[in-house]
Each structure stands twice: as C-alpha cells, then as structure tokens.
Amino acid sequence: MDVVKKSRNVHGSNDFSELIVSVRRVAKVVKGGRRFSFSVLVVIGDEKGKVGCGIGKHLEVSEAKIKAVNAARKNMIRVHLRESRTLHHDVKAKFCSSKVMLRSAKVGTGIIAGGSIRLIFEVLGVQDVVAKSIGSSNPHNVVYAVFAAFRKMLSPKQVANKRSRKIGDIIENR
C-alpha cells in the first residue's frame, strides 16, 4: 500500500523541509500470526543544495517518520547547483531495476518529473530540471537511483581539474 503524502515541516534549528514519499504497512509473519508495523520513506533538504533520504520502521506512523527523518539527517549529501536553480550537467544512474535520467533545463522550465523524483527536487531547491524514470517505479528504488545520480555528478571545480582548465572556462561555455 504505497501512499504519496506531501507533508512539509520545518524541523528543529537546521531548517530542513521534510516530505513523506511513501508510507507502507508491512507484516512480519510469526508463529501466532502476523505482526503489522509501518515503514516510512522520507526526503529532507534545506532547499539550497543539501538533501537526504531515510527509512524508518515502527508500530506507529508518527514514530516511523521520526526514525526516517533521523536516518535522512545522517544520510545528507551536497548537490552542486548551477545558479542555485538547476543541475550543472546531465546524469544517468541505476539502482536495482530503476533507471533515472536527470537533465539541466533553461530558466522557466520548472520541475518536469514525476512522483518521488519531484519531491526530491522540491526539497533540494531545484527550480528547473527535466527528469525521466525508466523501469521499476518502486519509490524506494527510484529515490536511491536519484541519489546515485547525485553522487555521480561533478562540481565545476572537479570538471576543470579533470580537463586541466580554469573554472571560469568551464562555467562561461554554457
């Protein structure tokens, strides 16, 4: 039972936005029957380039969400953005059978993405991006595929070092 819930909270002193991607009721089969609990997938971000995801499991949804937020805080990564609105370059990644393609976009394009990918870009602070999900649409796998893509991205400084050029040459040729 996957439910996409958009609940935006500003939590604690770090000012992170939280969005619930999915809430599932899971069952553990034991000798006496089934034991039900909840699994919550959450993405958090500061809307300035930092984003994290986490999963929490508990008997109650609210406790599972707290666990997921704590896991997401431990799993934060920094994504370098161009002009604080889009990605620096296009990137593809795969996690299990979910593949994602993320492309930078011109000003005014908006977030063209579906489902859980859109939620990630909202908390990341991206305003213009085109994203495509291919294969499995399982929210967990799609979220992890997007994070794999973020880890593959290079900052302009890394690209300049790789090409033995100055950062200004890389940025001005866009």
Swiss-Prot record:
Keywords in alphabetical order: Ribonucleoprotein, Ribosomal protein, RNA-binding, rRNA-binding
Pfam families according to UniProt: Ribosomal_S5 (PF00333), Ribosomal_S5_C (PF03719)
GO annotation, cellular component aspect: small ribosomal subunit
GO molecular function: rRNA binding; structural constituent of ribosome
InterPro entries cross-referenced by the UniProt entry: Ribosomal_Su5_D2-typ_SF, Ribosomal_uS5, Ribosomal_uS5_bac-type, Ribosomal_uS5_C, Ribosomal_uS5_N, Ribsml_uS5_D2-typ_fold_subgr
Residue ranges of domain S5 DRBM in the record: 16-79
Biological process according to GO: translation
Quaternary structure and interacting proteins, as annotated: Part of the 30S ribosomal subunit. Contacts proteins S4 and S8.
Domain comment quoted from the record: The N-terminal domain interacts with the head of the 30S subunit; the C-terminal domain interacts with the body and contacts protein S4. The interaction surface between S4 and S5 is involved in control of translational fidelity.
Family listed: Belongs to the universal ribosomal protein uS5 family.
Role played: With S4 and S12 plays an important role in translational accuracy. Located at the back of the 30S subunit body where it stabilizes the conformation of the head with respect to the body.
The protein's name in its UniProt record: Small ribosomal subunit protein uS5
Source species: Ehrlichia chaffeensis (strain ATCC CRL-10679 / Arkansas)
Underlying gene: rpsE
